[in-house]
């Protein structure tokens, strides 16, 4: 039974969700995966405003919207009036004015959504598709769904988040939610990319020492586009792979039953040996499958708030 108390006008950050919220969304996503059909009470319209490049998140939201029976408007930032100086607020207000119900937004600015959800004149539903290095709630929830499918519970699970921690919105969202769900969270990666704000959720340690104890190894992409010029010039992909990548030698030391996860896109041969991407214990492509159903659940929550479901 879906909890109607948990409907909401927007979904922008994991910080707004408690454990029960996350489990509620996971259960609805699982229901959609099992064949539940969405029923709209009126035509519903969505637009995906992506101001950063995306393959999985954008197309996954589009697929989710179509599976829900929504009408999806095309939008390309590079050919829009944003190039003429139009503000984000005016762009979103335009979408609302022409009848769009939900805007999924990816933006390079951390917490861009505050200027929208705190504006009393804006009624359109806002779903965060990723903000800078801040939050990625839909990726977080699809990851939680994938872990839940594998283990059934979070309490006592040991989860390692490894890689470019300071630039990763996935690291911040996942660490926060895993902690709320009762998992034991660990971090590893280059010290220069460690974010001390993560210490409230888990413990930073040595990759090779932690790896054999872990139930979930959550690899992170090196965020080349967010590195400083100096960091980018100093980065050596082969050295990174040897020090922090999931090599074949490291994979052989993983705990029996442990799984590999990665939010993608995957830098093969950097974060993970290419042959491990589709290994029997990899859940990377299952994460993508689950992303569609998780995003259906997220959109459903916003549509119910608007009385459209």
Curated annotation (Swiss-Prot):
It catalyses: carbamoyl phosphate + L-aspartate = N-carbamoyl-L-aspartate + phosphate + H(+). Belongs to the aspartate/ornithine carbamoyltransferase superfamily. ATCase family. Carbamoyl phosphate binds at residues 56-57, 106, 136, 139, 264-265. GO terms for biological process: 'de novo' pyrimidine nucleobase biosynthetic process; 'de novo' UMP biosynthetic process; amino acid metabolic process. Heterododecamer (2C3:3R2) of six catalytic PyrB chains organized as two trimers (C3), and six regulatory PyrI chains organized as three dimers (R2). SUPFAM superfamilies: Aspartate/ornithine carbamoyltransferase. Its EC number is 2.1.3.2. Keywords: Pyrimidine biosynthesis, Transferase. Gene3D superfamilies: Aspartate/ornithine carbamoyltransferase (3.40.50.1370). It comes from Limosilactobacillus reuteri (strain DSM 20016) (Lactobacillus reuteri). This is Aspartate carbamoyltransferase catalytic subunit. GO terms for cellular component: cytosol.
């Amino acid at each position: 039974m879906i909890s109607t108390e948990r409907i909401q006008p927007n979904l922008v950050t994991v910080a707004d969700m408690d454990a029960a919220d996350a489990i509620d969304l996971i259960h609805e996503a699982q229901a959609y995966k099992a064949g539940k059909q969405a029923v709209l009470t009126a035509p519903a319209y969505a637009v995906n405003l992506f101001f950063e490049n995306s393959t999985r998140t954008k197309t996954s939201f589009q697929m989710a919207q179509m599976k829900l029976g929504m009408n999806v408007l095309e939008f390309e930032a590079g050919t829009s009036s944003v190039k003429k100086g139009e503000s984000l607020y005016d762009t979103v207000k335009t979408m609302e004015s022409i009848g769009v119900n939900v805007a999924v937004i990816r933006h390079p600015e951390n917490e861009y959504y505050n200027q929208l959800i705190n504006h009393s004149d804006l009624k359109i539903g806002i779903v965060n598709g990723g903000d800078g290095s801040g939050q990625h709630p839909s990726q977080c929830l699809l990851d939680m769904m994938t872990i839940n499918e594998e283990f059934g519970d979070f309490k006592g699970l040991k989860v390692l988040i490894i890689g470019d921690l300071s630039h990763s919105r996935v690291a911040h969202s996942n660490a926060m939610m895993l902690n709320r769900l009762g998992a034991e969270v660990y971090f590893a990666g280059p010290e220069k990319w460690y974010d001390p704000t993560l210490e409230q959720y888990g413990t930073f340690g040595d990759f090779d020492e932690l790896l054999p104890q872990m139930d979930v190894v959550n690899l992170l992409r090196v965020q080349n586009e967010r590195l400083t010029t100096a960091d980018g010039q100093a980065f050596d992909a082969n050295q990174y792979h040897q020090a922090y990548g999931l090599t074949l030698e490291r994979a052989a030391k993983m705990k029996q039953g442990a799984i590999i996860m990665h939010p993608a896109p995957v830098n093969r041969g950097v974060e993970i040996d290419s042959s491990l991407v589709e290994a029997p214990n990899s859940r990377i492509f299952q994460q993508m499958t689950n992303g569609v159903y998780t995003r259906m659940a997220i959109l459903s929550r916003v549509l119910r708030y608007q009385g459209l479901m």
